[in-house]
C-alpha cells in the first residue's frame, strides 16, 4: 500500500482494488508524484510531504567480537606480567577486522517535504538572504550556476469586484459592458468606449492577460448579460427618434456601402453605417498620421504625441453639418 499526505489534510491514495490506479500505476511511483508536485504545487504555502523509504548501509560491529575484546582487555589489566601476543600476518589481521565488522542495510520510512522552496516573493526583500535567492533560482530553473542579479519588486492594485460595477450603473443600462486590451490608455481611447460613454453607459476596462479568457466564460452576472463593446451588432439604448435617424442613414448610404464593399472585397468582410464613432476627426487624425509617417505607429505611444500634434495642424478639418453621416465625414476626408 502506498500513500502520501498533503499538509494536514491527510489525503491518502490506496493501491489495493482501485481501478483508476490499476490502469495508471505510474501515478503511484515516487518519481512521478514528485514531478507533479514540483510542476503544480512547488510554491504552495503549506507543506506537502511524501511518505518515502530511505535505505542506508552502515558498518555494524559484531557483538561476539566485541565481547572477546573486552575480556582480553580486562585480563591484560589484571595481569602485571607483560602479555605475549601472537602477531599473525597482515592478511589474518584484515580478516579479523572484517569479521568484527560487517555491513547491514537499514530501512527507514520518513515524511519527506516536497515543496521546501517557499514563495520568497511574498516576503520582505530585506529579510531574504542571497543564499535563499540562489536556492530559489536553482529550484525554478534547474540551473546550478550562480544567478547574475536579483530584482525584487512588488506590484499591488486596488481589488475590485465585478458586482461593484452594478452600483455605479444607471438604471437604464441593461447590460454589463467590457473591453479588453493591453493598456488602460489603449482601451480608454477606443472608439467603442467613446460611443458608450457618450450615452452615459459604464464600461469595465480589462487589461490583464487572464481577463479575456475569464470573461468569455462569464455570460451573466446578477441577471445582467455581460457584453463586449467590440461585439458586432452591439445595441445601444436609443429612443424612437434616434432609431429613426439611424434607419434613415442606413437607407441613404446603402449603395455607398455596396460600392465600398466591392472595391475592398479582399480586404474587408463587411461595410456598414455605424453610430459608434462620435468623433470621426479624432479617428481620421490617427489614420492620417500613420499614412504621413509611412508606417504603423502605435497610436497610444506617448512619444508620438508631438508628431501627432504637428500633423493635426496640417490635417484639413472635416466638413459637414451635425446631420451629416459619420461615414460620409470619414469618406470625405480623403
Curated annotation (Swiss-Prot):
Residue spans of biased composition, Acidic residues class: 85-94
Main localisation: cytoplasm
Cellular component GO terms held in the UniProt record: cytoplasm
Region (Disordered): 55-107, 314-334
Listed Basic and acidic residues bias regions: 59-69, 320-334
Modified sites of kind Phosphoserine: 89
Keywords per UniProt: ATP-binding, Chaperone, Coiled coil, Cytoplasm, Nucleotide-binding, Phosphoprotein, Stress response
Pfam families: HSP90
Record's subcellular location: Cytoplasm
Coiled coil (UniProt feature): 234-267
Chain ranges for the short sequence motif TPR repeat-binding as given in the UniProt record: 327-331
GO MF term (any one): unfolded protein binding
InterPro entries, alphabetized: HATPase_C_sf (IPR036890), HSP90_C (IPR037196), Hsp90_fam (IPR001404), Ribosomal_Su5_D2-typ_SF (IPR020568)
Free-text comment on this protein's domains from its UniProt entry: The TPR repeat-binding motif mediates interaction with TPR repeat-containing proteins.
Family under the similarity heading: Belongs to the heat shock protein 90 family.
Oligomer and partners: Homodimer.
Job of this protein: Putative molecular chaperone that may promote the maturation, structural maintenance and proper regulation of specific target proteins.
Protein's name according to its UniProt entry: Putative heat shock protein HSP 90-alpha A5
Source organism phylogeny: Eukaryota, Metazoa, Chordata, Craniata, Vertebrata
Gene name of the record: HSP90AA5P
Amino acid at each position: 500500500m502506498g500513500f502520501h499526505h498533503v499538509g494536514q489534510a491527510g489525503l491518502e491514495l490506496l493501491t489495493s482494488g482501485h481501478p483508476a490506479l490499476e490502469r495508471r500505476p505510474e501515478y503511484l511511483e515516487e518519481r512521478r508524484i514528485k514531478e507533479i508536485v514540483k510542476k503544480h504545487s512547488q510554491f504552495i504555502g503549506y507543506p506537502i510531504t511524501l511518505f518515502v523509504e530511505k535505505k542506508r548501509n552502515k558498518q555494524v560491529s559484531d557483538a561476539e567480537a566485541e565481547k572477546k575484546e573486552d575480556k582480553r582487555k580486562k585480563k591484560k589489566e589484571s595481569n602485571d606480567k607483560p602479555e605475549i601476543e601472537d602477531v599473525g600476518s597482515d592478511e589474518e589481521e584484515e580478516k579479523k577486522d572484517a569479521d568484527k565488522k560487517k555491513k547491514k542495510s537499514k530501512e527507514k520510512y520518513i515524511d519527506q517535504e516536497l515543496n521546501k522552496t517557499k514563495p520568497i516573493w511574498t516576503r520582505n526583500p530585506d529579510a531574504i538572504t542571497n543564499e535563499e535567492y540562489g536556492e530559489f533560482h536553482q529550484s525554478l530553473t534547474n540551473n546550478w550556476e550562480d544567478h547574475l542579479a536579483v530584482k525584487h519588486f512588488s506590484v499591488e492594485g486596488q481589488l475590485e469586484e465585478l458586482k461593484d460595477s452594478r452600483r455605479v450603473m444607471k438604471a437604464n443600462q441593461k447590460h454589463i459592458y467590457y473591453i479588453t486590451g493591453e493598456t488602460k490608455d489603449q482601451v480608454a481611447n477606443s472608439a467603442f468606449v467613446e460611443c458608450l460613454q457618450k450615452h452615459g453607459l459604464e464600461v469595465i476596462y480589462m487589461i490583464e492577460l487572464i481577463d479575456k479568457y475569464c470573461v468569455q466564460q462569464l455570460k451573466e452576472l446578477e441577471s445582467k448579460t455581460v457584453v463586449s463593446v467590440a461585439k458586432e451588432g452591439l445595441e445601444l439604448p436609443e429612443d424612437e427618434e434616434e432609431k429613426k435617424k439611424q434607419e434613415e442613414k442606413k437607407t441613404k448610404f446603402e449603395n455607398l456601402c455596396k460600392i465600398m464593399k466591392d472595391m475592398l472585397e479582399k480586404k474587408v468582410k463587411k461595410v456598414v453605417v455605424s453610430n459608434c464613432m462620435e468623433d470621426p476627426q479624432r479617428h481620421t487624425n490617427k489614420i492620417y498620421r500613420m499614412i504621413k509617417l509611412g508606417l504603423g505607429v502605435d497610436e497610444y505611444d506617448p512619444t508620438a504625441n508631438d508628431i501627432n500634434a504637428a500633423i493635426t495642424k496640417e490635417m484639413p478639418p472635416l466638413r459637414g453639418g451635425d446631420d451629416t453621416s459619420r461615414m460620409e465625414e470619414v469618406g470625405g476626408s480623403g
